[in-house]
Each structure stands twice: as structure tokens, then as C-alpha cells.
Amino acid sequence: MDLKTAVFNAARDGKLKLLQKLLENKSDREVLKLMAEKTNGATPLLMASRYGHLELVEFLMECCCAPVELGGSVNFDGEVIEGAPPLWAASAAGHLKVVQSLLGHGASVNNTTLTNSTPLRAACFDGHLDIVRYLVEHQADLEVANRHGHTCLMISCYKGHREIAQFLLEKGADVNRRSVKGNTALHDCAESGSLEIMKMLLKFGASMEKDGYGMTPLLSASVTGHTNIVDFLTAHPQTGLAERISALELLGATFVDKKRDLLGALQYWKRAMELRHSEADCMRREEPLEPEPAYDCSREVSTAEELDGLIADPDDMRMQALLIRERILGPAHPDTSYYIRYRGAVYADSGNFERCIRLWKYALDMQQSNLEPLSPMTASSLLSFAELFSFMLQDRAKGLLGAGVSFQQLMEILCRSVLEIERAVKQPRPSPDPDPAQLSKLLSIILHLICLLEKLPCSPEQDQHKKETIYRFLKLQACGRNGFSPLHLAVDHNTTCVGRYPVCKFPSLQVASVLLECGADVNSRDLDDNSPLHVAASNNHPDIMKLLISGGTHFDSTNALQQTACDLLDHTQLAKSLIQPINHTTLQCLAARAIIRHRLVYRGSIPERLEAFVLLHR
């Protein structure tokens, strides 16, 4: 074990004497370097603060001059917090004496993590009232919000820490502050079921505002199923009749899909209907002109008799819940499409794939019409289709009875996936560049869909449609992680892992072949200057390497580390013996290598296209 690791472990475990022994006879410069170095992303002081080793913390600051503000990575409840300063870690873990010591040695009370979380917010999150009081006494700013605009008061309300919320309010916390998505502390109480804190917020002047989705605290409580909040707010004088009706209807939908309590749902729907009929002239509900096939053409019930009849048809009740939720929340709210997808998954689990696909396509329509390009929710929907189609194809291959996958079904989802890439890359400026992680995920999903399509028989017309779509996809020139083109991804084993369930296995010779046929650039480069051939070599796949070579790639072109594809082949694998460099090296390649090796001046002496060729061998 090296000295850096030994020092880190001693600090983490609170072994002061061992740490002193490790550092004896070390120069001040060596000690300072050890204090600033990170192991697993954390400094010794950060670890000692995280685990509450007071004597060790003071030794590190006083005798080792450990940097008191230097942040790092620290784990809480399985989540890695990046850029956390020692004071944040001590506050989150509830170590008051360590907090006092750090502040006494000059730690900034408002220093934040990478997500802009303060030590005060960390203490509020886990309910450490004594630390909250101490930090506020030492000028902690109550109103510093995290990157989502979520304040200390909001998190205290959401976590149900009544005493902390009361303390913050008494110290002047803004009771009506809004987050980035427009929600207030009242919304956090509603979503967590914290009724007593909600009553306190109202006494301090909290107002019932709508968030960015148009949700009031009452509707938020209905969505999360907190009946205590719904009962309280439906009787509150700030709540109008229309909102009371919507809240009860929405709560009934929550009872169907979240609590799986159909009888409970009926009771809330009856209460809503009684209120609606009590004001018939102004509370009439608008009906859609055409029933939605995805909902099996169901319509919302409008009379008490129709409502009573639902108990005999649980499936119709579930469609009622989806109809009600879409009407009240609208298609842009995440819960609307989420529960449509949830209901479709239940149908798939029972073998009713047709109903599942109809519902999922309807949810995908909503997402692509209302969400930003490359939304994680849209990507999740597209991945679910790929996983479902893979499962259905496996059943067919095993000879099991069940619905088969048609070429048209798969092709439609491929087209929808390509559309999502188009939406992302063709956004009008100054829109931000597409998120590389989400773009990479969607590119991988598309390759899995192409792989599944290659397993299905198709007519010449269908094959032409497929290849035109792939050509359109390639023309977008979208790249994923590390600048990987679709062809890079097709020959990389990491593309296999796109979700929780297996879809296709990569590297895929079939997918690489159809991409090349449709115009993929065989000499495209990633950010490390690797060609697809380099990636295929790293994966020890000689058949794909031969395919790429026959497609015109330069066998001896080098990457940023001056490595050829042959250099990357595993010497212990058979691939090395199957790929013979002499068979794929031209005189032109040898000449280019000689120019590079002897550092000959060639720019301006040869045609520009040959200059580019020489650069491939640098």
C-alpha cells in the first residue's frame, strides 16, 4: 500500500496515532502534497469530517495545514456527492463538533457542492436541527438554493422536519420562494404528506400558487395520493369548487394506478360527481370529439349509474383513470405519459402485447409533441419498445405462442427514434448542444432497433424503406460518447448494455454491414482519433475488421496514441493470427509511413488529398 492510500485510510478510520506515525519525518512540502491529494475522489480531511473524527480533523488542519475548503467526492446513502467541502460532509453526517471546529479554522459557511448545495441544506436534508441553528448563527444564507432552485425551507418541508422548517421561517426564510420548475414549499409538503408543516406555512403567509406544470399544492397531493392533504385543502377557503372536483377525480385515478384500490377510487369519483352535479350549469365537463383507440375507445362516465357500473369492469376503470389524468394534468405533465406506459407494461406482463403497443405509442406521441428533444422520458419509451420487441422475437424463436412482431411495428419505432435525433441536431440556435449521454443512449437504441429489424424477413419495398431511413439517420452525423459515430458504436461491446434487459449483442457484424451499405463513413474518427477499425480491434472481432477493411478503411492509420488497429489486437486471442498486416498494406501506405517516420516536409509539395492521406499515418 502506498503512503497516499495509507494516509487516506487512517483519516477515514479515525486512526490518529497511525496517521502521526505515517507523517513523521516527512517534510512540510510532502505533508502538504498528501493533504491535497485525493483517493477515490476525496481528501483525508474530507473523509475525517465525513465520519466525525474530531481529533483527527483538528490535527489535519493545525499540524498538516490541510486545505479546509478543498472539495471532493463523498458517499451518502449510496449516492456520490461531487465537489463536497469538508463542512458540507460534516453537516450532512450530523457531526456538530466537527462543524464547529471547521468553522473555527476558517471554513466558509456557504461553500457549496457541484450542485450548489450548501452545508445548511445538507443539515436540513437529514434533520440535524442543532447544526442548522449553529450554521445560521454563523451567517449561513437561508436562501441559497441548489441547481434546481430548491431551498433549505423546501427540503425541510419535503423531508418532514417540522422543527427545522419552523426555525427557518422564524429566521425569515421566504415562504413563497419558487424553484426552477415553479414549485413552492407548499408543493413539497403536499408531495410528502407533511400536513402539520403545511398548516404552519399557511400561518406564515404561504399562498397557493401553480407550478410550471399548472399544478397547485392540492393537485400535487392528489397525484401523490396523500389523502390527509387533499381532505385539508379541499376544505380550505382558498380552494375553488372546480379545483376541488379535479383534485378528487385525480385522487381517484391515483388510487387506481398507484394504490391499486378500485373501491377507494370509486368513493372519490362519487364525491367529485356529487360536487359537479351540484353546480350543473358551470361545472359541465367538455367531452372529446372522438374516443381514443389507445384507451380502447373508452369515454369518461358522466352519471352516477355509469359510475356504479364500473365496478363490474375493472379494465374500464383503469381506462377511466388514464382519461381523467390526461384531462386534468394535460399531455405535457410527466405523470400522464408515465401511467399510460405503466398500464401498457401491465398488459405486456399478461401477454396482451397489442394493447401494450397501442398505449406505448400513444404515450410516445405525447412525449415527442411536448417534451424537449432527447428527454430521458422519451428515450426510456423508445428503449422499452426495443426491449419488448426483443422479448417477443425470442418467444417466436422458441416456438412459443403469442403475438409476433411485424416489420411495420419495428420500422415505425425506428422512424420515431430517428425523428428524435433530428429534433436534437436541428434545434434552432442558440439552443444548447445535445446532451452527449442522452444522445449516445438514443444512438445505441437505434442500433438495437436496426439489429432487430435485420432478424425480420421483409419485402424489397420494405428493405428499401429501412435503408432509406438508416441513410437519413447517418446523414445527421450525430455522435455519442467520446465522439463515437454510429459505426463506432456498432462495433463496440459496450453498446450491448443500453438498459436493464438484454436486447441485442454487440459488436454486430449485421448492423455494421447495413450501416456501411447505407453510407456510414468507414474512416470516421472519435475524439481519440480512433477509427471504427480501432474499436473493432479492441473488441477482437476479426470478421468485423475484415468487413471494414473491405469497405475501404486504412488498415495502418493511427490514433492519437500513434497506435494502429493491429497494435490494439489482443495477442492472446486468435484474431491477431487471422489479420495479416501485409495483406492490407499498400505501397502508398508504406510511403506515407516513411514520410512520417523520417519527418520529411511534405506540405505544399504533394496534392492536398495526399496530405490528408499522410496524416492518417502520423
Swiss-Prot record:
Stretches forming TPR repeats: 245-279, 337-370
InterPro entries: Ankyrin_rpt, Ankyrin_rpt-contain_sf, TPR-like_helical_dom_sf
Pathway linked to the protein: Protein modification; protein ubiquitination
Domain of life: Eukaryota
Keywords: ANK repeat, Repeat, TPR repeat, Ubl conjugation pathway
Single Gene Ontology BP annotation: protein ubiquitination
PROSITE patterns named in the record: ANK_REP_REGION (PS50297), ANK_REPEAT (PS50088)
ANK repeats mapped onto the chain: 2-31, 40-70, 82-111, 115-144, 148-177, 181-210, 213-243, 482-524, 528-557
GO MF term set: ubiquitin-like ligase-substrate adaptor activity
GO cellular component, one term: ubiquitin ligase complex
Homology family: Belongs to the fem-1 family.
PANTHER family in UniProt: ANKYRIN REPEAT CONTAINING, ANKYRIN REPEAT DOMAIN-CONTAINING PROTEIN 16
Quaternary context: Component of a CRL2 E3 ubiquitin-protein ligase complex, also named ECS (Elongin BC-CUL2/5-SOCS-box protein) complex.
Function comment: Substrate-recognition component of a Cul2-RING (CRL2) E3 ubiquitin-protein ligase complex of the DesCEND (destruction via C-end degrons) pathway, which recognizes a C-degron located at the extreme C terminus of target proteins, leading to their ubiquitination and degradation. The C-degron recognized by the DesCEND pathway is usually a motif of less than ten residues and can be present in full-length proteins, truncated proteins or proteolytically cleaved forms.
Domain notes for this protein: The first seven ANK repeats at the N-terminus (1-243) are essnetial for recognition of Lys/Arg-Xaa-Arg and -Lys/Arg-Xaa-Xaa-Arg C-degrons.
Protein name: Protein fem-1 homolog C
Organism ancestry: Eukaryota, Metazoa, Chordata, Craniata, Vertebrata
Protein's gene: fem1c
